[in-house]
């Protein structure tokens, strides 16, 4: 049995297989997930687990080169937006409609119980060297 890191076997396998620039989405409970994109649904009930709780765990296991967020988060969810701006220096922004199209390019979408507007992020994998 693993003693540290991600215990979820699906996520551990996906993360081990990621390459440079591969995409991982952490999503609120309302983001539509395109057919054909792997999903790991962690949602238990509204608000649990939260977007930031999941992001904290994923960040501890994944090298993130940059992120992409929907520009609407800046005006509709300043709490999450501020947290993302504190964590990352390389942030791409696009409209929410464009964001949803970009989700189709992800290796996995991790669905949380988050129920606040636009609490979604695309993490672009970096390299450890």
Swiss-Prot record:
<dbReference type="InterPro" id="IPR023750">
    <property type="entry name" value="RbsD-like_sf"/>
</dbReference>
<dbReference type="GO" id="GO:0016872">
    <property type="term" value="F:intramolecular lyase activity"/>
</dbReference>
<keyword id="KW-0413">Isomerase</keyword>
<comment type="similarity">
    <text>Belongs to the RbsD / FucU family. RbsD subfamily.</text>
</comment>
<feature type="binding site">
    <location>
        <position position="28"/>
    </location>
    <ligand>
        <name>substrate</name>
    </ligand>
</feature>
<comment type="function">
    <text>Catalyzes the interconversion of beta-pyran and beta-furan forms of D-ribose.</text>
</comment>
<feature type="binding site">
    <location>
        <position position="96"/>
    </location>
    <ligand>
        <name>substrate</name>
    </ligand>
</feature>
<comment type="subunit">
    <text>Homodecamer.</text>
</comment>
<feature type="active site" description="Proton donor">
    <location>
        <position position="20"/>
    </location>
</feature>
<keyword id="KW-0963">Cytoplasm</keyword>
<dbReference type="GO" id="GO:0062193">
    <property type="term" value="F:D-ribose pyranase activity"/>
</dbReference>
<dbReference type="GO" id="GO:0005829">
    <property type="term" value="C:cytosol"/>
</dbReference>
<dbReference type="Pfam" id="PF05025">
    <property type="entry name" value="RbsD_FucU"/>
</dbReference>
<comment type="pathway">
    <text>Carbohydrate metabolism; D-ribose degradation; D-ribose 5-phosphate from beta-D-ribopyranose: step 1/2.</text>
</comment>
<dbReference type="GO" id="GO:0048029">
    <property type="term" value="F:monosaccharide binding"/>
</dbReference>
<dbReference type="InterPro" id="IPR007721">
    <property type="entry name" value="RbsD_FucU"/>
</dbReference>
<keyword id="KW-0119">Carbohydrate metabolism</keyword>
<dbReference type="InterPro" id="IPR023064">
    <property type="entry name" value="D-ribose_pyranase"/>
</dbReference>
<feature type="binding site">
    <location>
        <begin position="118"/>
        <end position="120"/>
    </location>
    <ligand>
        <name>substrate</name>
    </ligand>
</feature>
<protein>
    <recommendedName>
        <fullName>D-ribose pyranase</fullName>
        <ecNumber>5.4.99.62</ecNumber>
    </recommendedName>
</protein>
<dbReference type="GO" id="GO:0019303">
    <property type="term" value="P:D-ribose catabolic process"/>
</dbReference>
């Amino acid at each position: 049995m693993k003693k540290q890191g991600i215990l979820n076997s699906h996520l551990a396998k996906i993360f081990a297989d990621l390459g440079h620039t591969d995409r991982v989405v952490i999503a609120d409970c309302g983001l539509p997930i395109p057919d054909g994109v792997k999903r790991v649904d962690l949602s238990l009930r509204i608000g649990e687990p939260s977007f930031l709780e999941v992001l904290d765990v994923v960040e501890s296991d994944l090298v993130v080169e940059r992120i992409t967020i929907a520009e609407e988060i800046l005006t509709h969810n300043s709490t999450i937006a501020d947290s993302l701006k504190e964590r990352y220096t390389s942030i791409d922004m696009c409209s929410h409609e464009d964001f949803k199209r970009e989700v189709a390019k992800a290796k996995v979408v991790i669905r949380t119980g988050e129920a606040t507007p636009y609490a979604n992020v695309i993490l672009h994998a970096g390299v450890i060297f």
